[in-house]
Curated annotation (Swiss-Prot):
The UvrABC repair system catalyzes the recognition and processing of DNA lesions. A damage recognition complex composed of 2 UvrA and 2 UvrB subunits scans DNA for abnormalities. Upon binding of the UvrA(2)B(2) complex to a putative damaged site, the DNA wraps around one UvrB monomer. DNA wrap is dependent on ATP binding by UvrB and probably causes local melting of the DNA helix, facilitating insertion of UvrB beta-hairpin between the DNA strands. Then UvrB probes one DNA strand for the presence of a lesion. Forms a heterotetramer with UvrA during the search for lesions. Interacts with UvrC in an incision complex. Residues 436-598 form the Helicase C-terminal domain. Its main location: cytoplasm. PROSITE patterns: HELICASE_ATP_BIND_1, HELICASE_CTER, UVR. Residues 668-708 are annotated as: Disordered. It holds the Pfam family ResIII. It is found in: Cytoplasm. This is UvrABC system protein B. The gene is uvrB. Coiled coil: none annotated.
Length: 708
């Protein structure tokens, strides 16, 4: 493979310790492969051998931008924290889906049920995504930790770059012209409530809070000249520093020149006419009427205000691409010489492969029944072959690489089996599944007395919740973790486990790849003999690996028989354990538990930014308790009850009753009833999926049938 020679990226690696164990050899082999032009390599690294540190050393040595692809938000957040520590002076960013909840638009022909798109957007993750692209177009020392959402459409990088506003101290420009430029970047003017993505004007001073930054800009004018440019704290207005030169990037990823919208409307009208003719020739009059009404409404919205609900379905005409063309994604923002690391590739690669087929199947149904124009099919994730073309030089990283990775690398792997700490793979014990809960409870109590932690994997979410509740009733501090918790809640829960706020965590499929929990000395796998996806050889090896960071580690498989998957997982664990013991004996190494500080995670960073946003908003006019304000809370209460969030509805009710006694007073003078969402620890968490949050779309839900 020919390598595009570009200027080296100035990475500054913070090395808390030198590479050891198998790391030096693995680092050298990977660097040699990249520099010799190898298209693909595989790093077979056992759990706890420092694969992340190996990746960081490779990035620092080859001095090229890097993408770290992860299969879930929890692991991506952990990797982000680690790379931030390794590269404190470089641009390390976090790019995952910004949806806390997402119900895609769909139609079920068998029942004639149309489901409108419904979503809840996490504003903090949106900020982090925008920070990612702003760094990619402005510098080369960039490491992006991303999830599979990186293969979805993101807007044109060329349009993004063309709309960047370049400001210089002493530059001649009219104030109104500058304000129009900010509007073109999709920033909104709000002189009262200052928040992310907004700007305000105070005399000859313009203050703008970029959608991708934690600080704001103040641009001071003297007539038609930019006299001073400052970075300021949004909360207090205090100047951080002054600069002579400033780039302001678009507020959103989907931006385009105004003439592009008019051209797209013309193309959409032509496509609508063609599709209506097809429906009418087939006798599909209902579908034709449905498509005509919906599309004409959307086109009117586009013409008048520049956007419409579901505008992403018109992304191909708006981008000016040909039908069937590959959409622009995060990969198109990278320079040509970037390198890709696919972490836990045995899980991540199948995710990438599956995305396109599932998306297309759903959208074909919408097009065939008149809910969308055919151009909606081009609003899609990358096909697998398109993804392969865009990843450049790639390194698959896994303790259990699959056949695909081995085929790409011709069966060659770079092994990393020896841990720098001398830790061994854990001993595996098989215990009868009969009476497994009673036996496990006793084991958890033993670990709790030693200030150690326990991970338990169950087969279903319901079982995980019930087991956590039962353990709590028995006096054991226990929580559950599964997909109904959002990305920040999951990370927060794992940090609380490490900090000792509870002793046992029960999960389903999230307690596997990559989780770095040195305090865990016992991993218990319930119903290990139930052959299937959650109890396959790969799944068992990955789950066993969660106990590989503690010198007292042990794994218990609860089973009444030994399946083929169990036997292969036990054999592989024992093979690695023998290699590790021989290495330790040869070099006189005594295994010792890893001691890691509990780092400030991305959830803490997001929470701090959210608090600064709130303070900046509160610094404007004081909020007074009015009848309208109380009425709004009552509407929230009713909506929460409809979504089955009864605990939140009860808290809102108490708050409404409290505030009715203080009409006319400033809100800041009244002690507010706590309104945090329930469900993080032991509760059922039902009803969370439909919860509307700030940034949620206004999609209509299917009404629930009334009980007779």
């Amino acid at each position: 493979m020919s390598i595009t020679k570009l200027a080296p990226a100035a990475f500054d690696l913070h090395q808390p310790f030198p590479p050891s164990g198998d790391q030096p050899a693995a680092i050298a082999k990977l660097i040699e492969g990249i520099q010799s032009g190898k298209t693909a390599q595989t790093l077979l690294g056992a759990t706890g051998t420092g694969k992340t540190y190996t990746m960081a050393n490779v990035i620092a040595s080859v001095q090229r931008p890097a993408l770290i692809l992860s299969h879930n938000k929890t692991l991506a957040a952990q990797l982000y924290g680690e790379f931030k520590e390794f590269f404190p002076n470089n641009a390390v960013h976090y790019f995952v889906s910004y949806y806390d909840y997402y119900q895609p638009e769909a139609y079920i022909p068998q029942r004639d049920v149309y489901i409108e798109k419904d979503s809840s957007i996490n504003e903090e993750i949106d900020r982090l995504r925008l920070a990612t692209t702003s760094s990619l177009v402005s510098r080369r020392d960039v490491v992006i930790v991303a999830s599979v959402s990186s293969i979805y459409g993101l807007g044109s990088p060329d349009d993004y770059r063309q709309l960047v506003v370049d400001l210089h101290q002493g530059e001649q420009t009219r104030r109104d012209h500058l304000l129009l430029k900010f509007v073109d970047l999709q920033y909104q003017r709000n002189d009262i409530q200052f928040e992310r993505g907004k700007f305000r004007v105070r005399g000859d001073s313009i203050e703008l809070w970029p959608s991708y930054e934690e600080f704001a800009y103040r641009i001071e004018m003297w007539g038609d000249e930019i006299e001073k440019i400052s970075l300021i704290k949004p909360t207090s207005g205090e100047t951080i520093k002054t600069v002579e030169h400033l780039y302001i990037y678009p507020c959103k990823h989907f931006v385009m020149p105004e003439d592009r919208i008019q051209r797209a409307i013309r193309l959409l009208r032509e496509e609508l006419t063609q599709q209506l003719e097809i429906f009418q020739s087939q006798g599909k009059l209902l579908e034709a009427q449905r498509l005509s009404a919906r599309t004409k409404f959307d086109l009117e919205m586009l013409a008048e205000v520049g956007h419409c609900p579901g505008i992403e379905n018109y992304s191909r005409p708006l981008s000016g691409k040909e039908p069937g063309a590959t959409p622009d994604t995060l990969y198109d923002f990278f320079p040509k010489d970037f390198i890709t690391f696919v972490d836990e590739s045995h899980v991540t690669v199948p995710q990438v492969r599956a995305m396109y087929a599932g998306d297309r199947s759903r959208k074909i149904t919408l097009v065939e029944h008149g809910f969308r124009l055919p151009c909606a099919l081009d609003n899609r994730p990358l096909k697998f072959d398109e993804w392969e073309e865009r990843t450049g030089q790639i390194c698959f990283v896994s303790a259990t690489p699959s056949d695909y990775e081995l085929e790409r690398t011709g069966g060659e792997v770079v092994e990393q089996i020896i841990r720098p700490t001398g830790l061994l793979d854990p001993e595996v014990e098989i215990v009868s599944a009969r009476g497994q809960v009673t036996h496990l409870l006793e084991q958890v109590r033993i670990r709790a007395e030693r200030d150690e932690r326990v991970l338990v994997t169950a087969l279903t979410k319901r079982l995980a919740e019930d087991l956590a509740t039962y353990f709590q009733e028995q006096g054991v501090k226990c929580r559950w973790l599964h997909s109904e918790l959002n990305a920040f809640e999951r990370v927060d829960l794992l940090q609380e486990l490490r900090a000792g706020q509870f002793d046992c965590l029960v999960g389903v499929n999230l307690l596997r790849e990559g989780l770095d929990l040195p305090e865990v000395s016992l991993v218990a796998i319930l119903d290990a003999d139930k052959e299937g996806f959650l109890r396959s050889e790969t799944s068992l090896i990955q789950t066993i690996g969660r106990a590989a960071r503690n010198a007292n580690s042990r794994v218990i498989l609860y089973a009444d028989k030994v399946t083929d998957s169990m036997q292969m997982a036990i054999d592989e664990t024992e093979r690695r354990r023998v290699i590790q013991m021989e290495y330790n004996a040869k070099h006189g190494i005594v295994p010792k538990t890893v001691r890691k500080s509990i780092r400030k995670g991305i959830d803490t960073e997001a929470a701090n930014h959210k608090e600064s946003t709130r303070k900046a908003q509160d610094s404007g006019e004081a909020i007074y308790i009015t009848i309208e304000y109380v009425d709004k809370l009552e509407q929230e209460m009713l909506a929460a009850a409809e979504d089955l969030e009864f605990e939140r509805a009860a808290r809102l009710r108490d708050r409404v009753l409290q505030l009715k006694e203080h009409i006319g007073k400033p809100l800041s003078e009244v002690e507010i009833v706590d309104e945090k969402s329930a469900g993080k620890s032991g509760g059922r968490g039902r009803g969370r999926r439909g919860a509307k949050k700030k940034g949620a779309s206004k999609g209509t839900k299917i009404p629930r049938p009334k009980r007779g």
